Amino acid sequence: MGDEHSHHKIHSDFLKRTIENLGFNVIEVEHDQRVNIKNNLNIRILAADNCDPELCLKYFGCGIAEKTFGSTTIDTLSAIDNGEQVIINTNDCPISIAETSALKLKNHYKKINFLLFGYSSATAYPQCFHLNSDELQNSQQEIVKNFLSQGELYINLFNPNFFMPFAGRYVLGGKKFILEKHRAEIELEDALEYYLN
């Protein structure tokens, strides 16, 4: 086997098997448990929804699978630390879902040195939906506005020394290239300028 990969323990072992098939040794991390990876390098991973049935939409509570095997969510926040410096990654975690988990992370660490957060959408909406030009433009603007606002909320919550918007660039190519111009996107430089002002 090759390098190690850590991920939040989830009920389905599909993710674990897939990563192992790529040649990695997998370390499954229990929700909100700090795990030593090597020397003084540690990781803590939390399910974005903190296993809240109102957020994960399991209104009747967790089933036997979640209680026995852990979370079934795949969206996670993580903290990587060496005992002195802390990096927080919130990518793919809408703050409306992840606020409780984010607050838990904040309470675990006195100071956040570096914050990573997404600045753009990678979903099928709006480019894969039949919208008129006004609906498309309004949707694009609303999505960009929401992502910028979400990043701002994370910056204000964690108050890091440094931050980096990331994970917002991709290209629709091949047969779907025609949809590229309909994506809700903002250039990284424009997002950074927004956060610096």
Feature locations, PLM:
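Active-site HxH/HxHxD metal-binding segment of metal-dependent hydrolases
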Residues: 1-35, 47-56
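Cap/insert and terminal regions of metallo-dependent hydrolase folds
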Residues: 3-8, 73, 99-196
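Short, charged, low-hydrophobicity "junction" segments
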Residues: 11-29, 84-103, 133-142
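Short low-complexity, flexible loop/linker segments enriched in glycine and/or proline
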Residues: 16, 44, 178-180
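Short secondary-structure boundary micro-motifs
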Residues: 17-20, 61-65, 70-71, 139, ...
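Core dinuclear metal-dependent hydrolase active-site scaffold
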Residues: 30-111, 116-124
